[in-house]
Amino acid sequence: MLKLEPEFPGLPQRCDSCRSAPCAFYCLADSAALCATCDADVHSVNPLARRHRRVPMGVVAAPGAGGAFVVRPAGGVNSSWPIREGRRCDYDDDDADAAGEEDEEATSWLLFDPLKDSSDQGLPPFGDALVADFLNLGGGAGEKEDASSSKDCSSSHGKSSEGSHEFAVPGEPVPERQGFGAVSMDITDYDASNFRRGYSFGASLGHSVSMSSLENMSTVPDCGVPDITTSYLRSSKSTIDLFTAAAGSPVAAHSIMSPPQFMGAIDREARVHRYREKRKTRRFEKTIRYASRKAYAETRPRIKGRFAKRSDTDLEVDQYFSTTADSSCGVVPTF
């Protein structure tokens, strides 16, 4: 570790650049103690030099235990860190304060109290209060709070909705439901005998579902949402045919809904049938490809069915018979 040895003990350290003025700043990147003038000259050359971190130096104390001089900041707080290491600066207090604020903010996020914040800011219940609302379906305090909140919303927004949504087929009267009732569902049976070909059919499917009983389970009352009427679209022809077949015969419905699983077996059966028909018309006659070879083989002498060696007389006889055969049968073309 480099040491700063003052020329005169007890006097301020001189500048490492000009060696005349007392040093005012210490630069850790340059490892130099500079006066104000030299510091401005050195660190104004380029943007990289401007980013060097400098420590304002106070009075240089006596050498410490490590043999290096110690910086005493202007605030009067003595530092026990050597200057060459540059571990002490007057920004430490600011860093500590910032770290303390970050710790407090993290603690506030980790120890978040939803019930306290919701009661202070007027937000809907959260956490245990929400579970209490779900469990309190029979009435009581939760019902009173919901009734009061819905009354306030209805006074501010007008008669927009009472928290119930009706789902019905267009053309049918929708019954008016008031208060908190159970979920009701009316389903008209489908009559397959009244089915007519085409897109129109006489039977009707009606579904009326009241969602008013679910209002107890909602944390925020639905005040500004208008009445929602959902219309069921008319089914397509393929869908109608499918349900009609299902109502008429379960076997037909199963054959329609199930994918074709036996196509491979049908194809194999057709291939086997074609093979059998072809085998019936098959002929086992030998096809003579070379007529000259056949005629030559017929004239060769055989011993027990096998060809034997020929003598000179046999060759003459063969030639005689071959010329006779050629004159009678004609010339056999060769390819």
UniProtKB/Swiss-Prot annotation:
Additional observations: Plants over-expressing CO3 display late flowering under short day (SD) conditions.
Cell compartment(s), UniProt: Nucleus
Induction, as annotated: Circadian-regulation under long day (LD) conditions. Expression increases after the beginning of the dark period, peaks at dawn, stays high four hours and gradually decreases until sunset.
Spans annotated as Disordered: 141-179
PANTHER family on file: ZINC FINGER PROTEIN CO3, ZINC FINGER PROTEIN CONSTANS-LIKE 4
Primary localization: nucleus
GO molecular function, one term: DNA binding
Residues annotated as domain CCT: 268-310
Keyword Hydrolase assigned: no
The keyword Metal-binding belongs to this UniProt entry's keyword annotation: yes
Protein name per its UniProtKB record: Zinc finger protein CO3
Gene: CO3
Superkingdom of the source species: Eukaryota
CC per GO annotation: nucleus
Keywords for the protein's UniProt record, in alphabetical order: DNA-binding, Flowering, Metal-binding, Nucleus, Transcription, Transcription regulation, Zinc, Zinc-finger
Family designation: Belongs to the CONSTANS family.
Record PROSITE patterns: CCT (PS51017), ZF_BBOX (PS50119)
InterPro entries: CCT_domain, CONSTANS-like, CONSTANS-like_Bbox1, Znf_B-box
Start and end residues, zinc fingers (B box-type): 15-57
Function in brief: Probable transcription factor involved in the regulation of flowering time under short day (SD) conditions. Functions as a repressor of flowering under SD conditions, independently of HD1, EHD1, MADS50 and MADS51. Controls flowering time under SD conditions by negatively regulating the expression of HD3A and FTL.
Residues given in the record as Zn(2+) binding sites: C15, C18, C38, H43
One of the GO biological process terms: regulation of photoperiodism, flowering
